[in-house]
């Protein structure tokens, strides 16, 4: 079991309160249809806002257990929707999955996250996203330097 809490006060010291336990779990694993595209997000509340096939990382890093499950289940399209401050992590994930010939979309959230913008606004951004090309990946890498 895993629990998390979120503050709705803008001036809160911590936005999220996660337990100090291993995060090596796949959030909402029982509800994921591995035959469809998946969306990788940072937190549980982001996954709830996305609604369909969203997997929270409980942070910014993707653990090997999730990578293995994605590969084992032959997921073809991976949408990466991490906050803007996690662009470097998004790029690493994208690069990894592109090297395995997967279709990757990085969803540009601007300065928001799915839980703040809501399902409809997120879905619009997801629909507008395009498959990541090598050239666009290099642009993102340049931005991070």
How would you name each of these model-derived features?
Residues 1-77:
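Phosphate-handling DNA/RNA-contact segment within nucleic-acid enzymes
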Residues 40, 71, 76-81, 91-145:
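Replication-associated primase and helicase/ATPase modules
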Residues 50-51, 90-92:
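Short glycine-/acidic-enriched loop or helix-start segments at secondary-structure transitions
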Residues 61-63, 82-91:
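Acidic, metal-coordinating catalytic cores used for nucleic-acid/nucleotide bond scission
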